[in-house]
Amino acid sequence: MVLKFSVSILWIQLAWVSTQLLEQSPQFLSIQEGENLTVYCNSSSVFSSLQWYRQEPGEGPVLLVTVVTGGEVKKLKRLTFQFGDARKDSSLHITAAQTGDTGLYLCAG
């Protein structure tokens, strides 16, 4: 079975002073059930924290995790989230993807 994953680029408003761009890659991904996947989120700016969300079709985004400390790694079942040491990047790794993992994954800072 082919699973489809989507990631999105979010514009983030920090206070009301400037707009930061978070870039996620890949933007779209189709994999076979049981395969692993990694989604990356990068910025030129330092974030005090970073959040990952998952959105199912027709639903609002649901917070999966917040990472705060540079180098921090958090696990949620088969999902592993890592916040880069410099707090400018993060990754989401899904081990042995299942049909229930299908959705839109978003990072926000």
Swiss-Prot record:
PROSITE patterns registered for this protein in UniProt: IG_LIKE
Sites where a glycan is attached: 36, 42
Species: Homo sapiens (Human)
Database matches in SUPFAM superfamilies: Immunoglobulin
Pfam families, sorted: V-set
Subunit structure: Alpha-beta TR is a heterodimer composed of an alpha and beta chain; disulfide-linked. The alpha-beta TR is associated with the transmembrane signaling CD3 coreceptor proteins to form the TR-CD3 (TcR or TCR). The assembly of alpha-beta TR heterodimers with CD3 occurs in the endoplasmic reticulum where a single alpha-beta TR heterodimer associates with one CD3D-CD3E heterodimer, one CD3G-CD3E heterodimer and one CD247 homodimer forming a stable octameric structure. CD3D-CD3E and CD3G-CD3E heterodimers preferentially associate with TR alpha and TR beta chains, respectively.
GO biological process: adaptive immune response; defense response to Gram-positive bacterium; immune response; response to bacterium
Name of this protein: T cell receptor alpha variable 27
